[in-house]
Amino acid sequence: MDICSRNEKLAIRRPAILVALALLLCSCKSTPPESMVTPPAGSKPPATTQQSSQPMRGIWLATVSRLDWPPVSSVNISNPTSRARVQQQAMIDKLDHLQRLGINTVFFQVKPDGTALWPSKILPWSDLMTGKIGENPGYDPLQFMLDEAHKRGMKVHAWFNPYRVSVNTKPGTIRELNSTLSQQPASVYVQHRDWIRTSGDRFVLDPGIPEVQDWITSIVAEVVSRYPVDGVQFDDYFYTESPGSRLNDNETYRKYGGAFASKADWRRNNTQQLIAKVSHTIKSIKPEVEFGVSPAGVWRNRSHDPLGSDTRGAAAYDESYADTRRWVEQGLLDYIAPQIYWPFSRSAARYDVLAKWWADVVKPTRTRLYIGIAFYKVGEPSKIEPDWMINGGVPELKKQLDLNDALPEISGTILFREDYLNKPQTQQAVSYLQSRWGS
């Protein structure tokens, strides 16, 4: 995400997959069995899941930096039982609110960085629950979310940030990561220091290292094999650089990039390989689990590529080295959810222009299209996007939802993000959503 960015059927699992999973889940090492993450040579793209007749009405629920959940104050509660109770009640209250609004799918951030919101054999516990990396919060947040959402008839997609290890590189963060050395599992920061790079003022994994791709895939496999998630989603954080903090992967490129005409092509191939591995792995474990990506709204601008959109925005292909259009065409995704975070009047990246462009991309494919919209902008003063302030942002929101409903290629909408449903400036828009979607 752009922050600080199924049908439930019993899958028929092959014995070989079960054996591989047993090896993976019983091991405390961070290196997965090769059979879990490498699709067989010449394998076909995975079959897509069947679409529900009900439109997607989704919400992103971010846990990184405790943006949406758990409550920031809960980490200060010293009694583990009381702390867990407060966090669980906060989740229940949120789901009740979402249900009243007509939200039917929650995209729950289970891997915000190099830690987990479930008892993983590969990642340490997230510090978001207790304030300390590796400390058991006394319950399983992912299972709790699944239980509570499913009893309300809502689906849950496990949202992963694939490469991020930390949200900053401060000395205190380094001390926390190093402190996990004696834990099991320890942070990837100390287990595989040679995989770690600095990019965008964060510690990240080097996407060009094949073992990194396999390791990330094993984490997804762990969740899909152990939990009744309805889907898996990767956000837009692939290669994430900032002007003052570029990813130094020159050595990795020299080692692995010899077959490519440029470093940019090599980087795009790295993200392509990860998406393909994850896609095939999910379908080999539970074919009914959806796999999707939520990239930046612009694939490429027409000024750089005749196939691109009539826009002038930061392009996923060129900035994040994510050829998202290709992933759709190759059938690697059940759905794609581009973040079209601009109003109709934003000439550099008009909402309607991008929504229609993506509709044309998915039209000849089996990939579904959900549109991510910028609910976080509703009611916020902006000189370049004043539309979000007019009548509480309701007219702009209505236009976007009307277009999504009018284009048959668009199968739903996802709002970014949950906590903005509770802000004073969005309440007119929330009331409108309830009248439009709610029961």
Swiss-Prot record:
Annotated signal sequence range: 1-27
Keyword Hydrolase: yes
Gene3D superfamilies, alphabetized: Glycosidases
PROSITE patterns linked to this entry: PROKAR_LIPOPROTEIN
Keyword Transport attached: no
Subcellular location: Cell outer membrane
Gene Ontology CC entries for this record: cell outer membrane
The enzyme's E.C. designation: 3.2.1.-
Lipidation (S-diacylglycerol cysteine): 28
Predominant location: membrane
Disordered: annotated span: 34-54
InterPro entries to which the protein is assigned, alphabetical: Divisome_Glycosyl_Hydrolase, GHL10, Glycoside_hydrolase_SF
Membrane topology, from the record: Lipid-anchor
Record SUPFAM superfamilies: (Trans)glycosidases
Family per similarity comment: Belongs to the glycosyl hydrolase-like 10 (GHL10) family.
Name of protein: Glycosyl hydrolase DigH
